[in-house]
């Protein structure tokens, strides 16, 4: 797709993994309370979260879907693959979630995408609540690995 533009959002791995874990636990509760939700999600092929979760990547060290380490490992597999295979593509743009509340960042992103022609765009749309304190215990080793990948994306995005 040579004429396509791909926007790939990147979020701080610990914050992202915690958010994914919360969604997973939320869907597990919903599906335990109402089996129709579980069956419907299966029917439409949405197994990203919940009782019938299917990993996007085969877990290596962390198999417990109800623990943040599992979601950190999944983050690592996914974004390491994206970085290694797509970082040199001119039509792939990596959008750093934590910077979406920065007006200069948004303006530069729109200029790079040649989308800054509409001066009526509301550029201060995002209010990012970052750096939430994560209460879950996590493996610092897997977290360090995810941070290295995240920092590689930050370097691309200057």
Please place each PLM-identified region on the residue numbering.
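Conserved phosphate-donor/acceptor-positioning beta-strand/loop module used by diverse small-molecule
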Residues: 1-23
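Conserved N-terminal glycine/acidic-rich loop preference
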Residues: 15-45
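Short hydrophobic/aromatic-enriched beta-strand-loop microsegments
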Residues: 4-11, 29-30, 117-120
């Amino acid at each position: 797709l040579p004429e396509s533009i791909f926007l790939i959002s990147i979020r701080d791995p610990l914050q992202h993994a915690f958010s994914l874990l919360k969604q997973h636990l939320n869907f597990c509760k919903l599906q335990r309370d109402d089996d129709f939700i579980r069956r419907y999600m299966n029917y439409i092929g949405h197994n990203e979260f919940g009782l019938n979760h299917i990993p996007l990547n085969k877990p290596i060290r962390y198999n417990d879907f109800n623990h943040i380490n599992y979601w950190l490992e999944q983050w690592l597999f996914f974004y390491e693959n994206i970085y290694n295979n797509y970082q040199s593509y001119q039509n792939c743009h990596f959008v750093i979630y934590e910077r979406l509340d920065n007006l200069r960042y948004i303006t530069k992103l729109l200029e790079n995408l040649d989308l800054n022609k509409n001066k009526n765009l509301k550029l201060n749309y995002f209010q990012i609540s970052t750096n939430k304190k994560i209460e879950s215990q996590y493996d610092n080793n897997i977290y360090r690995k995810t941070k290295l990948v995240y920092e590689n994306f930050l370097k691309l995005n200057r």
